[in-house]
Amino acid sequence: MSDNDYERFEITDYDLDNEFNINRPRGRQSRHQQIYGIWADDSEEESGGEGGTKRRGRAARKPKDYTMPVNFVAGGIQQAGKKKKKALQADDEKGSQKEGAEADQGEESDDSAASGRPAFGQNDPGSSNSSSEEERPTLSRKQPSTTFQHRSHIASERNVGAWEQHTRGIGAKLLLQMGYEPGKGLGKDLQGISHPVQAHVRKGRGAIGAYGPETAASIGGKTNKSIKVDEDVREAKEFKDQLNKWRKGSAGGAEPMERQGKRYYYKSVEEVIAKGHTSGHLLSEKLSKKLGNVRVIDMTGPEKRVLSGYHALGQAKITPEETLYDTEATEKGSAPACVFAMPELTHNLQLLVSQCEQQIIAIDNQERECSSQQAALESEHRKLEEIVQLERNHIRTLEESLERVERLIDNPDLSLPQAERLFRELLVDYAAEFHEFGLADLAAGVIAPLLKRELVQWQPLENPTEPLPLIKKWRGMLQQGDAAEQQPRNVFDPYSSLIWAGVMPSFRSSAAAWQPKEHPPMASLLDAWAPLLPSWVLDSVLEQLVLPRLVAGVQEWDPLTDTVPIDSWVLPWHAILGSKLEEAVYPQIRSKLGIALRAWSPHDRSARAMLTPWQKAFPEEEMQEFLQRYIVPKLQATLGELIINPMHQDLELWQQVWEWHELIDPMYMAQLLDRHFFPRWMQVLVVWLNQSPDYAEISRWYTGWKSMLSEPLLREPSVKEHLRRALEIMHRASDTLLQPTVTPTPPPPVPPAPVIMMDLIHPPAQLEFKELVSQQCADLGIIFAPLPGRREMGKQIYRVGKLFCYIDRHVCMVSDGSFSNWKPVSLNHLLERSQTGIL
């Protein structure tokens, strides 16, 4: 195969149109190619006479000229389905094409004549090989009618049913007869469509999206009829224009474009401005000046373009005026040959047009900027006028408020009601200036002297509530507003300064004449003024006016000769002064009370009455230390004088000691009883048990002493231990009487021994005490069973007949059904009372 003759493998529109056409024309193989197949030689030297006829036709084609410039070929898939029109060509190209066509025609006719078979798809007007319906008459005139024409049976099927487009169906008529209403849907719920779905024919057989965005299917009858009417009008107008311009041509029946009338297209200023507003059309003015002298070569199009600068990149390629708006020439991708072409003149004209457009766009931009700047300046001017007017109003307001302030300051005969009226005008009518300039601070320098002069005749201790309405009125004026506005500007806020400079002088004069022992007047004064006084002012009154007077009164107080109790005029200040009294007053009181208690005796009950009010005032440690130092030694001596006699007990001394248990801590009271009471009490109990007494009487004596002790004291370990030992001694003493009933032979009599508590301890019995009680109950037929879930002091409770008891070591604690009152009893007494249920 020669260099100029090669086979292309790209897919063209012809391949897509004849993809499924079995009668498409194909190249005929020579005899040599049929024999040797792929091993056949296609070179011109070795080709025989069989293939010479075709090669002669191919050799007659015009060879390619490689000296000509490179022409770019448009890539992609060509738009198929459109009718192609003949383009105007030069005379030499017509001659060469005519010669090539005659050679090809002669070759095909020879092959057809040699084969003796009809040639399919050559001159058949219904064959798919023909390009369009308009070209068929021309081709038929050029080709001779010597060859046999064979029509394909497939081509005849194209016009089957074409007559239906001239008829009218009766489907709509039948629907109207069945009750169909035009414009509504079909079916019971009118959900069906009455028009078929309109399908849009694609331009070719390429892939989806190859011809632009796909058109969605629509329902017939719902399209906008006005659009179709406009299209029909436009097509009719175009057809009329073409008909008027039609003139019979020499070759194809159409007049060349050069002979037709020229059309001129004008751009308005609005179009140029709108084009300039599009992004990327023109570069900015600064960038255009910088890049204006740069030579740019554009090779992105079919041919090379030399541009004067980067600003020309966004402009379209220069096209002749004749084909500027020719849609058909644009679709073909080629323009008619230019007879008169002057690139330099065209470039200069285009440059002038571009410069003119740029000037128009620049003027428009400048006009827009000036308009925006003018609007901004007008807006700023209006704002400045408003600011000037506001400042004038502000100055006038300041002058008016200044005039009232000068009347407050410069008037020596100003009274408090007049000052109040001016002050209220400033607060109400000039509130912004009042808060901005802190006019409330005038209260300390202007209002306070007037208030002090107003309160000269006021007696605070006699009439504490007289000036309260006036002070409440000034507090409302000086403390109104938000919390942020009430923050003090100086050391004191305005209201505190007014109270300190106007009211405190009257408080100081009244406190100097106040007697501390007469506390109600001062207490009433502070109770009435406490809600109105600032916290720091109230603290100052208590610390600087009240506390010094209390300290002076305590120094003058004598507990032995003074008839007024000190707690009546000192303790009322405890809730207010608190720690201040503990530091300055209470130590002096304790010191004087201790001196007075040196000669005190417990039979004098006034000491306890004098100390009881101070129990909650003094700290707990200080109070207990004071009692241990001055009271407990006196109580120890009294307990030493107490005589414990079970037969005739005198409890006077015991009451003198026991009445202090509310003041003395239980721990210290337990230590006092452990050292000075319980040893002698245990000794008396042991002596009494050695004299064969009545154990019921001993039990009552034990219960009586225990009931006199308080619950906190009974929980002390030392007291509990003494009571436990007493119970154990009582139980062991009762066991000596029950010993003969347990064993058949009584033990030998014990010789008398000195009364010593250790001698009363017997060796342990062979049985446990619980087993002994159970055995005795079984012998007498008495029920002895534990109660599930019942415990007292951690001990199991048992049912013994009609009574309930629990065993604490070797002592029986008995109670009735209340389970509240428990008392110790002997085993014999338990067995006797268990049958009757009476303790």
Swiss-Prot record:
A single MF term (Gene Ontology): nucleic acid binding
GO terms under biological process: mRNA splicing, via spliceosome; spliceosomal complex disassembly
Region listing for Disordered, in residue ranges: 22-164
Main location: nucleus
GO cellular component: catalytic step 2 spliceosome; cytoplasm; precatalytic spliceosome; spliceosomal complex; U2-type post-mRNA release spliceosomal complex
Biased composition (Acidic residues): 102-111
UniProt feature, compositional bias: Basic and acidic residues: 88-101
Residue numbers carrying Phosphoserine: S43, S47
Chain ranges of the G-patch domain: 167-213
Record localization: Nucleus
InterPro entries referenced in this protein's UniProt entry, alphabetically: G_patch_dom (IPR000467), GCFC_dom (IPR022783), STIP/TFIP11_N (IPR022159), TFP11 (IPR024933), TFP11/STIP/Ntr1 (IPR045211)
Annotated positions of the Phosphothreonine modification: T53
Coiled-coil annotated spans: 363-411
Biased composition (Polar residues): 140-149
Record PROSITE patterns: G_PATCH (PS50174)
Sorted UniProt keywords: Coiled coil, mRNA processing, mRNA splicing, Nucleus, Phosphoprotein, Spliceosome
Function, as annotated: May be involved in pre-mRNA splicing.
Protein family according to the UniProt entry: Belongs to the TFP11/STIP family.
Subunit structure comment from the entry: Identified in the spliceosome C complex. Interacts with pnut.
Protein name: Septin-interacting protein 1
Taxonomic source organism: Drosophila melanogaster
Phylogenetic placement of the source organism: Eukaryota, Metazoa, Ecdysozoa, Arthropoda, Hexapoda
Underlying gene: sip1
